[in-house]
Amino acid sequence: MLMTAAGTITPARVFVVGAGVAGLMAISTARRMGAVVSAFDVRPSVRQEVESVGGKFVEIPLEVEKAEDAGGYARAQEERVYLRQRELMARVVAESDVVICTALVPGRPAPLLISGDMVARMPSGSVIVDLAAEQGGNCESTVPGQTVEAHGATVIGPVNLASSVPHSASQMYARNISTFLLHLVEEGKIHLDPKDPITQETLLTREGEVVNPRIREASARIPGGTAAGRSA
């Protein structure tokens, strides 16, 4: 909301799709700027996190058996689930001035959650920021690496966002890598514990075998891949 001598301007309506780290940051930033913020995530468990940073969690009833994996990340869903999600999100998107897309599935292309028809129903001059553009985008109108006009809306598809803040990105990357390596060291030597959740998620091959489920699954989709388990 903006108050001026000429009157009061109503706040912008912001809808955030995906409530991971980027989504929660987008919610809190938009709230600090005075926007009315709503958000949705296929994982109902994040509702409290959305509300804790000032967003309103949008209830969208979906028949999803397993919305998240053991690490808390969203799982890939069948196309019928995404189709139903688009149908139920259409009204919320149509009422929004800004939509920020952050929905990603580890190891998979970004799910398509906003169709061109949904963009066309948004108010003229609306803005869509698709943070999933590098993985294909959550919005059908997104062009990775470009800002385009679609159905009267501006669609921004940034890629390699870390390069826009190289100093801070380098600091965070170095800190995370050093913390990860120290986690693997025990008494001055590298120690790989197969029961450790971090090791399970990051270990790709061991003793000539592909042990990471995501890599095995990705290999199965490539002709001549190593789905059988042997590493190249």
Where are the regions that the model predicts?
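Glycine-rich phosphate/diphosphate-binding loop of Rossmann-like nucleotide-binding domains
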Residues: 1-92
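ADP-ribose/adenylate-binding Rossmann-like module
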Residues: 98-156
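Catalytic cores of large soluble enzymes that bind and process phosphate-bearing ligands
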Residues: 42, 77, 81, 88, ...
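Structural motif
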Residues: 13-15, 35-38, 55-57, 97-99, ...
